[in-house]
């Protein structure tokens, strides 16, 4: 059986990257929440 996680840097960035988060209102909310929490890394 093949593994379900087949990593791809491009897909990772496109789905979870900073620019993708900034492109939607809810994504910006996610970043704001992570800043408020004091996360060192905001996005993938």
Swiss-Prot record:
GO biological process terms, semicolon-separated: translation
GO CC annotations, alphabetized: ribonucleoprotein complex; ribosome
Signal sequence bounds: none
PROSITE patterns, per the entry: RIBOSOMAL_L34
Coiled-coil intervals, chain numbering: none
Domain of life assignment: Bacteria
Segments of this protein annotated with the region Disordered: 1-44
InterPro entries per record: Ribosomal_bL34 (IPR000271), Ribosomal_bL34_CS (IPR020939)
GO molecular function, one term: structural constituent of ribosome
Transmembrane segments: none
NCBIfam families: rpmH_bact
UniProt similarity note: Belongs to the bacterial ribosomal protein bL34 family.
Protein's name according to its UniProt entry: Large ribosomal subunit protein bL34
Species, as recorded: Streptococcus mutans serotype c (strain ATCC 700610 / UA159)
